[in-house]
Amino acid sequence: MGIPENLTCLLRNLYAGQEATVRTGHGTTDWFQIGRGARQVCILSPCLYNLYAEYIMRNAGLDEAQAGIKIARRNINNLRYADDTTLMAESEEELKSLLMKVKEESEKVGLKLNIQKTRILASGLITSWEIDGETVETVTDFIYLGSKITADGDCSPESKRRLLLGRKVVTNLDSILKSRDITLPTSVRLVKAMVLPVVMYGCESWTIKKAEHRRIDGFELQCWRRLLRVPWTARRSTKSILKETSPGCSLEGLMLKLKLQYFGRHWKRP
């Protein structure tokens, strides 16, 4: 890779015989050796992984490969974030070719493809894959960087999942939000800072249908009713709830703002 020997020797000595301990509420554990995996609190680990990943992708020829998906006149065949890598192609043959190239180049630098953590997502029919005698699992959806990706591209499962996660956060904060020691404006700010971002995560790419609009509006109203301790059985208009809480921009409005910002950034790209 062209890295001087003195630097590789320094890194090797840094990781050789590395030990760690875990501190808990009951004290610290015994020291144990770290054989492989992520080196906790090591600022070098992400840099080293990115260096290897870039080296593998370049040697695999992914930059010059014709396989991939055309987006805004650009050919994209791989997405990488930290240690998550996604390969994309328009056909099964192209995808398998990309995967085998990456696998071969990875083995040259001592990295092995973990079939147990590898998934295939296809929008159509696909044959069963076997690599080194192991079958690669084919799925209809999976979680990538915190968002659920489905084979049919439907955003409804992800929006429902996000609303469910938002409700869990509200439940966890229930004692704080209902505390009489916290003013209503502070509680509203807590919801906007800790609950709504959970729901809005990844919403820039959502296609929101009428049913989702109703669910989103219902979730937001449920949050404000909870702050005011107003049950659903109470005859209280939505307008009066919003007037008392004064949340400002609605949840749907915040989502629209994120969508426009996302669109604007891509529109300005050359």
Q: Model-found features: residue ranges?
A:
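Nucleotidyl polymerases of mobile genetic elements and RNA viruses
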Residues: 1-257, 261, 269-270
